[in-house]
From Swiss-Prot:
Residue span of region ACP-binding: 258-262
Organism, scientific name: Nitratidesulfovibrio vulgaris (strain DSM 19637 / Miyazaki F) (Desulfovibrio vulgaris)
Catalytic residues (positions): C118, H257, N287
Subunit structure: Homodimer.
Family indicated by similarity: Belongs to the thiolase-like superfamily. FabH family.
A Pfam family matched in the record: ACP_syn_III
UniProt superkingdom: Bacteria
Protein name, per record: Beta-ketoacyl-[acyl-carrier-protein] synthase III
Annotated function: Catalyzes the condensation reaction of fatty acid synthesis by the addition to an acyl acceptor of two carbons from malonyl-ACP. Catalyzes the first condensation reaction which initiates fatty acid synthesis and may therefore play a role in governing the total rate of fatty acid production. Possesses both acetoacetyl-ACP synthase and acetyl transacylase activities. Its substrate specificity determines the biosynthesis of branched-chain and/or straight-chain of fatty acids.
Gene behind the chain: fabH
UniProt note: domains: The last Arg residue of the ACP-binding site is essential for the weak association between ACP/AcpP and FabH.
Lipid metabolism recorded as keyword: yes
Top EC class of this enzyme: transferase
Length: 330
């Protein structure tokens, strides 16, 4: 487990982007063997957004980044680092962060991708904080973007109904206005990697003309993912609270990874937090993986649910297996 603590760090701007195209459960009924009732009762999801043809993960990240920069009152040229969380990059090389950097007109920044799946944003906060600790003058743009609908097997109703496309972004600096990043914890267990996979890497390479196999798409052992997700999200949330001398009563709002309503409810039960203090928007966006948490933060602010003065607990889990938690004081 890695931790970042006692390092002054401000999350100054937030932005989120979701594509215009909306795919409802009723739309899915037309070409997937499923129903709105089946999806809603098992997941809580009613719709998800889908990138248009020719639109990629870097495009979504760029739009979210522009909004985050505007929210922070900063110009792209002030950014020194671009770090991007994704498991659905535009290419294996160049990295998506470099593409975002170019689209924003940034020159000379350090830019790289990383993959912590659905835990990406919280992992990114940990990395951004470490960068700021080493270089107090750093101004870090953190993006989290996914184009998951490009990697779904539409014949597998257990996975294709879950995911959507979108992006979120934040600007992190040592000083200035914005939410105080009080603490962040991240952990993983590679022994659980087989529970949630997306193929197409060197383990499952594809040559031109090869038929696309099922292992190219999202594959998931839903039952085991549920069990480990609930256990680890709750445990690391309790850990980050305890190490800061806090209890769940000191948290005004919990923003969990928006994967499945049953998972969110089970984590809330374990933490002993009432449902009205847990932010949920997966019915609108589905599971957007790394983009889920920053998208939820931006949405909660826009809806007036997240207000200045509130302490927020972020809790995530994802393929790898990865998980993390962070405390933000707005």
């Amino acid at each position: 487990m890695t931790a970042s603590r006692d390092i002054a760090c401000r999350v100054r701007g937030f932005g989120a982007y979701t594509p215009v195209d909306v795919l409802t459960n009723f739309d899915l009924e037309k070409f997937v063997e499923t129903t709105d009732e089946w999806i809603t009762t098992r997941t809580g999801i009613r719709q998800r957004h889908r990138l248009a043809e020719g639109q990629n993960a870097s495009d979504a990240a760029t739009e979210a980044a522009r909004l985050a920069l505007a929210d922070a009152g900063m110009e792209p040229g002030e950014i020194t680092h671009v770090i991007n969380a994704t498991c659905t990059p535009d290419y294996l090389c160049p990295n998506t962060a470099c593409l975002v950097e170019a689209k924003l007109g940034i020159m000379g920044a350090m830019a790289f991708d990383f993959n912590a799946a659905c835990s990406g944003y919280v992992y990114g906060l940990s990395m951004a904080r470490a960068i700021v600790a080493a270089q107090p003058e750093a101004r870090v743009l953190l993006t989290a973007t996914e184009a998951l609908t490009r990697r779904l097997n539409w014949a597998d109703r257990t996975t294709c109904v879950l995911f959507g496309d979108g992006a979120g972004a934040s600007v992190i600096t040592a000083e200035g206005e914005g939410a105080l990043l009080e603490d962040v914890l991240c952990a993983s267990d590679g022994n659980l990697g087989g529970l949630l996979t997306i193929g197409g890497g060197t383990h499952t390479p594809y040559a031109k003309g090869d038929p696309v196999g099922e292992d190219f798409f999202v594959q998931m052992n839903g039952r085991d993912v549920f069990k480990h997700a609930v256990r680890n999200m709750a445990a690391i949330s309790q850990d980050v609270l305890a190490r800061n001398g806090l209890t769940i009563d000191d948290v005004a709002l919990v923003i969990p990874h928006q994967a499945n309503l049953r998972i969110i409810e089970a984590v809330g039960d374990r933490l002993g937090v009432p449902a009205e203090r847990v932010f949920v928007n997966l019915h609108e966006f589905g599971n957007t993986s790394a983009a889920s948490v920053p998208l939820a933060i931006a949405d909660a602010r826009a809806k007036g649910v997240l207000r200045p003065g509130m302490r927020v607990l972020l809790a995530t889990f994802g393929g790898g297996f990865t998980w993390g938690a962070a405390l933000l004081h707005f």
